[in-house]
Amino acid sequence: PDKSYNGYFMPTNNGAGATHFLMDLWGNVVHKWDAYPAGVKANLAVPGIKPEIHPDGTLWSGGLIQDWDGNVLWEFYPPRDVGISVADMPFHHDMKRIWNKKLNQWTQLIVSNRNRTKAEADAAGGDPSVSQQAYGTRLQATDYIIEVSMDKKIVWLWDFMDHTCQSVNPSWPRYVADPKDAPGKFDVHWMTDNQRPNGQAGFVRDWVHVNSVDFDEETGHVVINPKHFSDFIVVDHDMTFVSTTDFSKNIAAAAGPDGDIIYRWGNPSSWNAGQAPGWM
């Protein structure tokens, strides 16, 4: 503990009847919350407020905020609140409470994913000769980030599939001669860490696998960790948050050029700009 970053940590006992613990670096339990229902991820957003992602059956389906005493202050469940099925918006791994300066309120960034279609894969630069049947499960669980307001509206969305390129065939969509000339895009045909065991480039199930998301309030930038690319990427939230009333405009802006990656660090080989780091 003497050599660690000073502070506290929040381990979770996953599974039925899970409990979130707030502990100091010596392992002393400072406080604990019974998950509602069994939680899989929690963090201390502000004193006494604990955002949590929790599962519904076998899918991670909602997020909530509890106070210090465990009272539920806010809960978001997509099928009920926005009419989106759990299959199309399962949450996983991380949730970050942020201050949205344009809305002048707290909002929640949440990692989610959904299955994609062959048409979506083709439009993103995939090989059009691959059939939906041949894709099989390879188009399942591709990540995106949503921002949810306190009145349970999706006010912003950033999707990996909107920011892709390919250098395989100039007749396919989103062609670039060399991915290093498009550092703001993900090379669809770069073989991710998840693809290397079976040697299969292109889209694969759980293509990017985001483990964490964070927000820098000063710059208005979102930091995302797509694990299977061994990268950290930065995208501009505030530049693409263009309307406080018509949230579809924010989603469209985030899908466009202003939503491209503005900084990436970790694995230059993923956009043909250098060698893979030795610690991948």
Task: Give residue spans per PLM region.
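Histidine-/acidic-rich catalytic cores in large beta-rich domains
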Residues: 1-280
